[in-house]
Structures are given as C-alpha cells and as structure tokens.
Amino acid sequence: LERNRVSGFKGLSVLTEKYGIPVFEADSYFLTDDKTKAFMAENEFEIAVSMGWQRLIPPEVLDKFTYGVYGFHGNSGYLPFGRGRSPLNWSIILGDTRFNLNLFRYDEKADSPNVFATEMFSITLHDDIRTAQYKNMICSKNLIKKLLKAYREKNIAVRTESKDFDSWYQKRTAADGKIDFHE
C-alpha cells in the first residue's frame, strides 16, 4: 500500500482532545467506506477546512457542506498553475522566489481555481523546506481567520477566474531527496 502512504502525516488528536473537539476518522482515504457514508448521511454540516488532504473529496461528501469544504494549495503563480503534489518542495527546487498560498473551495477536480483568498510569502536563498513550511503555516492561520470571519458574516466570496495557465507538479517521494555524490 505504498501508493497510499501519506507524506508527513501527523494527526490532530493532541489538539482535538485538548479542546474537546469531536473527531470522525474515516476507514478509507477515498471517503467511500460504509462508515463514512453513514456518518455523512446522519449529520449536517456548514463549513469545513481541510489541511494536507492529498485526495479528491467525493461530490457526495462536498454536497453535505452548506458553505463548502476549503483546502490549501500553493505555488509560485496562480491556480490552476502548479496543481498536484508537493508544491512547496517544487517551488524551492525550481528556485521560485515567492509562494502564493491559496485557500480554495473544493470541487470534484484537483486544486481547482475556486479561490477564496491568497497570501504570498517570499522564498529566500536561506530558506529550506522547514522554514518555508513555517511561513506557510503562518499564512494558513491568517487565511483561516479570514474565512471564519466571512463565514460568520455569511459573506464568503470565491473567485474562479485565473491569471495563469494550467500546469501540474509531479509527486515526490523520499527517494527524490537522495543525493548521489558519485555522479
């Protein structure tokens, strides 16, 4: 099941237990298992924020959320540029000097340009993946605050037009980080 391995997975149980937040854990990463279907059918939802989810979310799950399911995807351009996997890694590898983190509303396609808001940060020569992830987390928090404010005001506006062309980042694995000093 290597193809289903989630890169850098860390659960949120430490935070959810601390703050008494109920959690549902699906039996299938594709959200198509009977347990998930029953949970979705038995509950009503208004809004969701997903972080680090690396799969499409089925329409029958998305349709259960009145205001939508929102996720993050970044790149050096504007969605749909840089769809796909490991965008922060690719931005560093390609020598990009900026990273646009988009908070977008999920639909049935990967990383669609249904953008609620974008926040940009610089990538410098001194950044590595750890410092870039830290900057990314700060932007994520800011974007979630904006979304929750708009949600409370019942005023979530999503733009679907894009300034950029469609392109894809390929999946990276641990083997891609190996350096052969003999070549």
Residue ranges and their predicted role:
Residues 1-183:
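One-carbon transfer enzymes
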